[in-house]
A protein has these predicted regions:
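Short Pro-Cys-Gly-centered "Cys-loop" motif that presents a nucleophilic cysteine in a tight turn
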Residues: 1-62, 70-315
Length: 315
């Protein structure tokens, strides 16, 4: 039942940045009529003004939208509820329809400010290319994107270009600077095509985008200092997000055990069944729900089944 489905992991705190995404119910083309896209863009700018959001990038596609948004106040959920609810009311009134136009609340990935946030903005700006709506050389023509606004003489006050430009080689907010930025996007599009989407594919999955240090800090906030960080199932979230949190918790526990056993994780022997590795694996299996697959990969112990065999011999 829908009522029992877990909600996605989401933290709200001052100055947090997010990659927010939602799709039309049954993947229907909500924004294909120009009026629907224009109405959503209007609601988006109204939401930014009402909730004080700083909008780094957005793209309104045929059946979904992407936002790279910074929230000076911890109000993402309230703002998204207003944005989607207001647009849905106007959408249904315009079409004489009823029901939910979106497939659910929304998905929001935490994004580390700076380089990671700029990468998300590039990903968002390149959405029309990946969707084969137009080629990279015509990207500035796509109307329902922050890139289109950045190229205009006047833009909404909520749009902020500093991070996008600074992390693209320190470009200036000028006509020349934006021309260089669109050239840079064309290069990224070509690289992404060669790698079959691998470069940008991770920017819409999981629950956090950023460095390991940033992920660790969010994990601390999420678990509120609880030593039993494995109780993450209670927090809900999609499968990829839960798995990412599990692995972060296992890594944290492994480091603590290694310190207690005086084992240097950076200088483990190559031997798959080295005593140091087996002791670490045994301690992890005794105190966590760690998988053999994770231990085998993290400690270079060969096949997952080998981990249990090595631990049994130790016992």
């Amino acid at each position: 039942m829908l009522a029992s489905m877990p909600r996605k992991l989401r933290l709200e705190f001052p100055d947090a940045c997010y990659h927010a995404i939602n799709r039309g119910n049954y993947r229907r083309n909500l924004f294909e009529p120009q009026g629907a896209a224009e109405a959503f863009e209007t609601c988006l700018f109204e939401a930014c003004a009402a909730f004080g959001w700083r909008l780094h990038a957005f793209a309104i596609m045929r059946n979904h939208f992407h936002l790279a948004v910074e929230t000076p106040e911890p109000n993402l959920s309230d703002g998204m509820k207003w944005l989607q609810g207001t647009w849905a009311m106007r959408f249904n009134r315009y079409r004489g329809a009823t029901g939910r136009p979106f497939q659910g609340r929304f998905k929001a990935l935490h994004v580390e400010p700076g380089h990671a946030l700029a990468r998300v903005a590039h990903y968002i700006h390149l959405n029309p290319v990946r969707a084969k709506i137009l080629g990279a050389e015509r990207l500035p023509e796509f109307r329902w994107s922050s890139l289109w606004w950045y190229l205009q003489k006047k833009r909404p006050e909520c749009l902020v270009a500093e991070t996008v430009l600074a992390e693209s080689g320190g470009l200036a907010d000028t006509k020349t600077g934006w021309r260089r930025y669109t050239d840079y996007l064309a290069v990224l599009a070509e690289e992404d095509s060669k790698r079959r989407g691998e470069k940008f594919g991770r920017l819409s999955r999981g629950w956090v985008i950023g460095t390991e240090g940033f992920k660790a800090e969010l994990h601390r906030k999420l678990t509120r200092g609880n030593a039993d960080a494995e109780r993450i199932e209670l927090l809900g979230g999609d499968r990829a997000a839960r798995q990412q949190l599990r692995e972060e918790a296992w890594e944290k526990k492994l480091r603590a055990i290694a310190k207690e056993l005086r084992v240097d994780l950076g200088a483990l022997p190559a031997q798959k069944s080295a005593p140091e590795k087996v002791r670490l694996a045994a301690a992890m299996k005794a105190s966590t729900s760690v998988s053999n697959g994770w231990l085998a990969k993290r400690l270079a112990m060969g096949e997952p089944a080998s981990v249990s065999q090595f631990v049994r011999r130790l016992r």
